Amino acid sequence: MSDDNSVTKVAAFYQFAALPDYRELREPLRAFCAGLALKGSVLLAQEGINGTIAGAPDAIDAFAHELAHGTMFGGRLDNLELKFSTAEAMPFGRLKVRLKKEIVTLGDAAADPTRQVGTYVDAAAWNALIAAPDTLVLDTRNAFEVAMGTFEGAVDPGIKSFGQFKDFAAERLDPAKHRRIAMFCTGGIRCEKASAHLLARGFAEVYHLKGGILKYLEEVPEAQSRWRGECFVFDERVALGHGLRERDKDATRDQ
């Protein structure tokens, strides 16, 4: 049975995968999304795909099926990281499908997640990892995102863009001192690329939260959670809490 199509369903997705024909994929993907009346933003690059889109539940399900199993990508997105949530209203004004040099910009050619990444840790195992005294817990997001919410004991790199993460790592992280690093981000893409960067620099034990904060908030009960605050999202919902609940907009206006 299909979902209630009166609800707006949101899909956040990414995968690092070799897409040498990414330029040729732009128009077919745009046309497919437009035909389903989807809105949002999709990035295509030689290293993969990254995006967040919204629409009717049936349309989102058709989109997800095409990416993972359809002919457009020919099975190359068979390990797609995909997270679903809902919105009270359409959180995007239009559809954008753009070509990029990177699907998340770090600016380090040696950081290639299609070749090597850190160890994935699912939401259920995350609490134990970050509670260990010899684990450095590292938030890879921008400072304004960290200010809205983060995990207990996490280090804030104080960066304004993800491209500055490599400078933070060069100045503040030492493979000899920081033997175990656990990183996280909104949906998993930034910390996955950051893990590739640290491995290329000689860090041996690097972990990252599979599915990111959003998957953690979806799966871990609030009573067991080590997350504090809200998770910023790059759409009109602004921020999500435990259970992926939208921020109370009326309460926000009253502040």
UniProtKB/Swiss-Prot annotation:
Instruction: Name the InterPro entries for this protein.
Output: Rhodanese-like_dom, Rhodanese-like_dom_sf, TrhO, TRHO_N
Q: Which GO terms describe its molecular function?
A: oxidoreductase activity, acting on paired donors, with incorporation or reduction of molecular oxygen
- What's a BP term from Gene Ontology annotated to this protein? tRNA modification
- Alphabetized CDD domains for the sequence: RHOD_YceA
Question: Entry's Pfam families?
Answer: Rhodanese, UPF0176_N
Family (UniProt):
Belongs to the TrhO family.
Q: Which residues form the Rhodanese domain?
A: 131-225
Which PROSITE patterns does the annotation name?
A: RHODANESE_3
Keyword vocabulary terms for this entry: Oxidoreductase, tRNA processing
Q: Which reaction does it catalyse?
A: uridine(34) in tRNA + AH2 + O2 = 5-hydroxyuridine(34) in tRNA + A + H2O
Enzyme Commission number(s) from the entry: 1.14.-.-
User: Which residues does the entry assign to the active site, renumbered to this chain?
Assistant: C185 (cysteine persulfide intermediate)
Q: Where does the secretion signal sit in this chain?
A: none
Q: What is this protein called?
A: tRNA uridine(34) hydroxylase
The main enzyme category here is: oxidoreductase
Give the disulfide map. none
Q: What does this protein do?
A: Catalyzes oxygen-dependent 5-hydroxyuridine (ho5U) modification at position 34 in tRNAs.
